[in-house]
Amino acid sequence: MNSPQQPFATIPQPRPDGTLQVTITYLQMTRAPTGSAGRSRVDDLAILRVRKPSVAFYRFLYNHVGEPWLWYERRALEDDVLAAILNDSKVHIYVLYRAGAPAGYVELDYRVSDEVELAYFGLFPEQIGIGLGPWLLRWAVETAWASGPSRLIVNTCDLDHPKAIIVYQRAGFSPYRQETCTITDPRSAPFWNQPPAGSP
């Protein structure tokens, strides 16, 4: 998640050596929360599962949600590798629509037995700040728990919105591990400025 007013507020300036130091926090939820997401206070919403989305459509979602936060892992994948993930029946993509247009997405990964990973979750920058984030997260948590796993996991890092970890904790996640690593700044990679092939 990010802020429409200052979308790059937490992103460090490029370093001369082309690297970034990132602290990753891993969180888990070992019991389903009580209650339900209910209705959002924002009107004209729909959440639809996209079965086997095209690579172009997925990249549109991933890049639009993730670019302000330097999401790069899926961006760096070749199309055939990404397509294999998207075509896996245990990877579920849900798109949030507002007034008929994409507003964000959720990716739930069921590939590990008895565990669900909230692999990706976020809103388009223009949809942030109106109360959609916590509601969509609660919806994602309820959907993940419906399969009866032992735990639900997610991770966030200090490139994300500064309130991201607070939102996860309020939803019921608890940190269980943290690590700091050095990565190549994705802004220096050829794929970063490469336009996606095709169109959504």
Predicted segments with their positions:
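Acyl-donor-binding surface of acyltransferase catalytic domains
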Residues: 1-51
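Conserved active-site alpha-helix within GNAT-family acetyltransferase domains
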Residues: 5-13, 159-178, 185
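Short amphipathic alpha-helix that is part of the acyltransferase structural core
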Residues: 39-74, 194-195, 200
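Conserved beta-strand-loop-alpha-helix junction that forms the acyl-donor binding cleft
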Residues: 128, 154-164, 181-187, 191-192
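Conserved GNAT acetyl-CoA-binding A-motif
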Residues: 144-156
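Conserved glycine-rich acetyl-CoA-binding loop
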Residues: 124-138, 159-163, 170
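Short acidic/polar active-site loop segments enriched in Thr and Asp
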Residues: 92, 150, 174
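A conserved beta-strand-loop-helix scaffold within acyl/acetyltransferase catalytic domains
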Residues: 73-80, 86-125
